[in-house]
């Protein structure tokens, strides 16, 4: 059975048109049992590909195309955990060297973008034979980039063959496409040079780990090269391998690939000419079609299936371990955590014995779950970060769902009492979810936050910690501008279109765009406007480049670069993994968010300025009932006041007229998409002013909605509503919260709604009360 072992996705950044999910789904539809994803110089799309392939029932094989300093791109496949680690470390060495020597990452330079290039056979630019180029460093590549000769600067950008040899264990090498090292050597140095390069690869990887790659994509000179490759494979005793090296999931994505090529080379479709691929053959092909194409060489097809079986490694065998916390002698992680939590509980609840007794029970329950899930080390490491901040007099505050944990409160990670506030612990941690908790720490932005980040590097090593990535994608306005330039639309029309489509950010990108473009003064029947709509829709959510998450850090026991490749971050002294926070979370890699807040910097500066004048301020001891402060709030005198400085907040403050601290909690929560979309703001304000009676959809909701006058304003209330009316467990309630997330899934929401209705029906809640509860909950789908 044929298996494609050299696919490229959109995570080759403008060199592929299909998302990893689309490739996996197409391979499954073609009844391929496996698929290998080999993106350029990275494993950026590997986690998404792994999840999608697992979901559709095919085996997700891992690899990458590695740019060589000597020229060409070398496809490498991970056969074992050792091979995967070697691939990650090879890619890391390539990427991080740019930071060490001050070189930028290789990317299309402006000089390379559309001026002085003629067509390569694969559709990428090749330098014209100018006098300045003759014999001075530019060699022709058939497939991809202009291939420079091995100069010092270029040696520092790509991986050398010596470095590849150092990391060859557990890897299988393919000889590559027209941009591979073998084809490049054949074209520039002739058969002798190509034979030398092939022998070098065999010496590096071993005869059983080098496959001579054949492709038939209706391209000039392809068969001549294939004949030479077949003869050399026979001479060397190497197996042949048929691939199509697809950049598309389906042939119909060719217009999108052309647009991406234009974006990459800063040109238009009108002017791109031979920059574009010369046909649409680089798509995932059905096995029978590959068998027909290679009818004269059936072993090349058969070898693909046999090699796919041999490639046993998937991301399931990632081997990530969270760091061990250095414990005092004789202590276990859970024992030391119990000791710290009990000591903190005695301090936190010293003034209220009744609450202290409730807190003891809650902390014991949480610690039991933490022990079962083996998470004690995680809490100790976050506690260690907080303690470092305190030692260094850096303001620090836990935020988010961690505030629902009595253990976090006792450890001093958070400042909200979840026992007194009756917060739902399962919102933070649940045995049913089977994943790591997520604790976010707010820090003063600037140098103080950077000191904490550097402390993490010092504690766990430069190769043991890194920032998480943020994948910047084509969406809305940005996508419109790029597509408009590709189509050579007038600048004023591009600007009009980009403003218009920005209003569609939170809708389905295909939501009758062509019809609605008339609103922007466009003729939807015009060929370029029609093509704009098609390309704008197709490019949505494709990756544009890799950014850095605002504060997420991942840490590892040992070397993180054996788990995921690292790259230099834009800021000196930092590194970033090639995966975003969702990818890391899905693969069990633990993230801690160290988030910088300008307001915390302002507070810290103010505290230090007051201390210099002899006034010591403790934020925890400031009175929460100062009438002067509430008078200012009621008058909307809040310019520059964190959380209540927006126009919407200032417009609402005189109507809500906060009088106590809990009123401020409501004030901040009420100006959010959930309450606004759900039409909850005005009912709450009317009830607060006594102009409307307080009612609840069902008596079981009265204790949950009492403090907010029968109107659900907090996600916490929604989860408790689901538990009270539909019998949801804490874990099921957390699933509901996820379905309500910003990137919500219509399918997931439909499943949750059906489960809510069934649960309420079992408890006798039907008709209008059930509908009112459903409306209240689903209104938070953008919250």
Residue ranges: model-predicted function:
Residues 1-103, 107, 149-783:
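Alpha-helical scaffold/interaction cores of sigma-54-like transcription cofactors
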Residues 104-154:
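Long, intrinsically disordered low-complexity tandem-repeat segments
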